Amino acid sequence: MREMGVTSQRGTFVAVLVVVWLITANAMNVRAVLFQSTGDPAYNTNAPTGALAESGWQYEGFWSTSLEVFTNHYPVGNWLGTPIAPQFFISAAHIYGSTNDVFVFRGVTYHPVAQYTTLDSDLAIWQVAETFPYYAPLYTSSGETNSPAMVFGRGTDRGVPVVVEGLTNGWTWGVTNWVERWGQSTVSSVTNFGLGIGDVLQCTFDGDTGSNTCDISYGDSGGGVFIENDGVWELAGINYSADGPFNVDATSSNSFNASMIDAGGLYQEVTPGDWELQPATNAAPIPSAFYSTRISANLDWIESVINFDVGPDLQMDGVQINGNDAEISFATGSNRVYYVESTADVVNGPWSTIISNVPGTGGIVTVTDANAASSPSRYYRIGLSQ
């Protein structure tokens, strides 16, 4: 196995860097979330058992997106998402997706019909046409700091070691095969990334949770982070990002992404083009960290989507066949105008408007889809015009 050698001395900094793509083929592969303790490719690829049983694995589904994301790394996305209501799952907004994609939960395929995002975080909620058999409870407390966490993802293999002064201080990120894995960490702090991201949970790669200590990498976005609350594991975060890239000098020409036990002596890109030297001292290691969007900071928005708290409207009351027609009833709000669409193919569409400019009354409104009973089976959805 060839190593990426990084040689550092206090007061001077001399480095020899082997380009990552030349050496990853010789490295031990570790798939999805990365571990300090082992290179076993089968490690934690099944549901946790014992004291960690029912700690979140059962709530994770496969969110397969067709839109190219991070084109240099993968042509499509095979991410994770978490059901949080009978017809809603949550994931990361930056992995995109569309209503032409599918979400697979416990072997059953679900078809998204609508997406909800917010300017305050990297969260995206997707509504599906079908109904989930169960879904994850949300962490509603504010006591995440110092809490043990279960982490789920489908990220990269572990790459080659990053060796500093003869010590393996981390591993580069390799390639991914989208295998789901689980690991453990501890929430070290809550921090705010500002407009568009908001509060995130910070977890460091410092080995404080034993052999299951993990970091996240490319492909882990959208995976859930769970915290135990009164014996119940609740969804507390959605994987967003990790520290890096790193470099041996203050340029980006030889930068690399890595999970670092100790980043001391390396440069880290803190903002695009801005490299900051991590102090190389003997006092304490400087582990890299990963960040997950904080659920508890976004509860008002989440509940407004999954509970329709934006108003009592946009909830389907029922569809009844009356003769050869279908009668679609739905809740409305006053001073709002609606439209109703239908499709015979919820996966590929297209959706056709059967009626528009339906005035809301503050109660149940019924509209008619003429001759629907003699047509192929249809799906309906309601939209807000104003």
Task: Set out the residue ranges of the language-model regions.
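N-terminal secretory signal peptides that target proteins for export/translocation
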Residues: 1-11
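C-terminal subregion of chymotrypsin/trypsin-like serine protease catalytic domains
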Residues: 28-59, 66-67, 72, 77-95, ...
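Extracellular/periplasmic catalytic domains that process cell-envelope and extracellular macromolecules
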Residues: 74-75, 82-84, 96-97, 104, ...
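Catalytic-histidine neighborhood of serine endopeptidases
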Residues: 85-121, 131, 144-152, 156-163, ...
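Acidic glycine-/aspartate-rich tracts in secreted/extracellular proteins
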Residues: 94-98, 129-134, 154-159, 189-193, ...
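Chymotrypsin/trypsin-fold serine protease catalytic domain
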Residues: 129-215, 219, 236-258, 262
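Short, composition-biased motifs enriched in small/polar/acidic residues
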Residues: 307-386
